[in-house]
UniProtKB/Swiss-Prot annotation:
Belongs to the UPF0125 (RnfH) family. This is Protein RnfH. Pfam families: Ub-RnfH. SUPFAM superfamilies: MoaD/ThiS. It comes from the Bacteria. The lineage of its organism: Bacteria, Pseudomonadati, Pseudomonadota, Gammaproteobacteria, Enterobacterales. The gene is rnfH. NCBIfam families: PRK01777.1 (NF002490). PANTHER family: UPF0125 PROTEIN RATB.
Amino acid sequence: MSEIRVEVVYALPERQYLRNVTLAEGSSVEQAIVASGLLELRGDIDLQSNKVGIYSRPAKLADVLSDGDRVEIYRPLIADPKELRRQRAEKAKK
């Protein structure tokens, strides 16, 4: 069975984590994240609540990866985007 290389990334406002991992062909998004070691390094990553993607497109943990893919772990939103837009619009009126 051949191998694939993928990147796993997790970005915080103050720091970015980028891990290159080599996996067996047919590996999943979840397997790449586990192999990257980011779950142990960052206790705030919870795969049950954090969304993931491949090159900015939403993905599921079971999705199969291709060679050269970039797996992204997204942080939860801290504010509702609709509420923020409403607040900016009100502020602009003043």
